[in-house]
Amino acid sequence: MIARILALAAPSAAVSAAQVLTQFAETLVAARLGTDALAAWSIALPFVLLLQQTSAGAMGGGVSSAIARALGANDHDQACALVKHALWIAFIAGLLFAIPLSFLLPWLFSRLAGDEIAHTHRFYPLAAFGLAAVPAWLVNTLSAVLRGGGQHRIVGRLMVIAWLVLCLLMPLCALVLELGLAGIGLAQALVFSVAAWLMWQKVRSGQAGFLPDLSIATQTALFKKILSVGLMACALALIANLTTFLVNARLAAYGTAHVAAYGIAARVEFLMVPVSFGVGAALTALVGHAVGAGQWPEARRIAWTGAGMAFLVTLPFGLWVALAPELLASFFTNDPEVREQAAHALSYLGWALPAFALGMTLYFASQGAGRMHGPMLAGFFRIAIAVGLGAFLAVQSELAASAYYVSVACAITVYGLIVALSVRPGVWSQANALGSLTNSSGRR
């Protein structure tokens, strides 16, 4: 079983490694632009992460799991038809990011960081969302189509190249060409557009294992197959990033340095998402195939094997972050106050990262199984603890900003535990099938 997971996880893990490297580079570039730029970038960060998470792991998981279940049930016609529906979802969702955020973020910059910072970085949202949102949705959706067909290697090759090119292009545009934060967004728009076109060439030529049927009329039932998992997963991504935004808003009362510092800590926290996705993308497909064939015990074994692998991989990193936070903080910023606060936040966060990675990996497995109620419950506990407990401790104790660092660490730990508890026979079984999945698959 480990060999099966590794065979599919290796390409996704390579993509995740390249993505983590690129995200580190993005954080470093933003920090090199100065504390004001880092503060603006930190305010936009939850929305940037939301864009990636909803298009890749969330709705992408819905696309991948729907296609995997169709192929697991030997319904190739349905898999062919699902591609058109997935592309419609991607295009509309991309516009829902591009248009509102191009205008909302400059206002948020002004409210949370000041008019001067908002004016200086006003073009960043236009580039990062106005130009990049639709291409990002398209490339991640087409990647999900290929993963649903088990073609992880094709996705791996293209996306590793894309992330590495982006890693080089961001500092070129932002620092060398002196475009500032807008250069980061412009680089993302260029890379995602080219990657989306290349990914479409793979899908349209049948390299997903089937030829997409774009002539078929759209069907509500096929949209539901994707959205029954994808919408709930998107809601979870929204909750996660709303948590980050609300904590950032609370920390704004303590000064710009605290906002910038938490941006660094939040980026490290969310690095667990692509790391978990490296294994989780394989689990979505493998679990989806097992569920499509009615093999629920096999699906649970696959999920827990993959989750254990993710936990063991992230444990050393989490311990290093917790025990040596100053080293990581100093890598991102030279500002003494920002560095001190970032190290303080990371010293709490590091202990929680392995449990968070475990929960995130099982979340991706839950997509393949169509079992999203456990992750959804975990998401609500996450925001309640991070924001609610943080506010309580900040008022009732002398922890001040540290209250939010502690509460965020507690929140992602509880998230992992709740998702883990949901992956059990009483939930993951044919008898407990979700109504939407039952109706779409014809099983009870």
Put a short name on every predicted segment.
Residues 1-12, 67-132, 165-231, 287-352, ...:
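Short alpha-helical transmembrane segments in multi-pass integral membrane proteins
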Residues 10-65, 129-136, 224-225, 230-289, ...:
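Transmembrane helix-bundle signature of multi-pass secondary active exporters and lipid flippases
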Residues 23-24, 61, 102-103, 140-141, ...:
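A generic alpha-helix surface/boundary motif
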Residues 32-33, 111-112, 149, 176, ...:
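Alpha-helical structural context
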Residues 37, 151-154, 180-181, 257-258, ...:
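Membrane-helix interface segments
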Residues 60, 128-147, 155-166, 184-199, ...:
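Short runs within selected transmembrane alpha-helices of multi-pass transporters and secretion channels
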